Amino acid sequence: MDKLLLLVTLVCGTQAFYMFGHEFSRTRLGDTIDKTSLKILKESYNLADDKNVIASPLGVMLLLSLYESGAGAQSKEEIREILGGGEAQESSHTYGLLNQRYAEFDPKFLTVAIKIYVSDQYKLADAFSRTANLFRSEVDNINFSAPKNAADIINRWADEQTQGHIKTPVSEDKIDPATAVAMFNVIFFQGHWHVPFNASETEEKDFHVDEKTIIKKPTMRLLQSLFYTENEELGAKMIELPYKEPGFRMVVVLPDKIDGLPAVLEKAAEKGLLEDVFNLSPAGRDIELEIPKFEIRSGLDLNTILPKVGVSKIFQEPAPAIVKNDQVVVSRAFQEAFVKVDEEGATAGAFTGLIAVPTSSLSRPPPSLLFKVDHPFLILHEEDKILLLGHTHIKNCICF
């Protein structure tokens, strides 16, 4: 396998329905996160040189919804648009409750946490502090005038929250000594397949990088009855792999054409993918699944990506209600993420940061069906809302 488009999705809704023993939830919020996530993924794909990207748009959206409560008028309008519309209080309340719901999951397989570091020279505005509490944010003071020490403190938190998988997402040069407040979000997931792959059956197999290039990759094999669908409109086939953890699953989206990934992504960015995922149904026969094992690590420059999806004012417009007695503006927005898929399951996580400085110091049974994943494809880990997503040119990723 060489190019991979990875979507890691978490589905947690309120209006549930059942199909063949599976519980699904479809909500307006889930659809909003789905569509916004695919737009961010599309821009990430277009900007990536090597096409190895894993990301968590949900992590970005949670921080934006928190920031919105103290932002300027134009920033609020842009943020509301990608968060699904509505008034600012409604948006913060909705995403705050979502964050609370995630915080109640068993941390053995899902951690969602927000940390706010406030400069010793500043205090959070009262209203913003109340919103931070709604998001169950931890708030600590920190001395940003010592950038290396500040970065070390933040990195220790990231390392702890991701169980050692993301150790140093914040470098010293990302910390402006004039920083007033920095907000960070961690999403970490560790799932085990309901039916594990047999490691003894993993072997080197061909993966089509493109129509002219074939490489060898360690490929796992599973013969199992699975949910499956063929989508002519999308130009892809889809298959579901459930986890032992209740409600979670991974969905593989395999383009019909070897070079079909960009076209599938283009269509997915227009309409989202959750509707297609909810249309999955039992294949009616065993699926002979072959899929590479892999590990991807990547970083996103959100200063570049967010304006392409309609959020640019946070980097320009002063936010009057984040801290007391001053206005701030976002100087840096970034994310570091990873995913690992092997015979036992999948581990994935993302660390997202928004750093704001004072405006005065602004900076930026029948026969089995063969489902052979041997060319660029898409996958979703899901329970109704996109948790992490990405794409990769597996030729240069870690395959083990």
Swiss-Prot record:
GO terms for molecular function: serine-type endopeptidase inhibitor activity. The keyword Iron-sulfur does not apply. InterPro entries: Serpin_CS, Serpin_dom, Serpin_fam, Serpin_sf, Serpin_sf_1, Serpin_sf_2. It is found in: Secreted. Disulfide bonds: none annotated. Keywords: Protease inhibitor, Secreted, Serine protease inhibitor, Signal. Inhibits chymotrypsin activity. This is Antichymotrypsin-1.
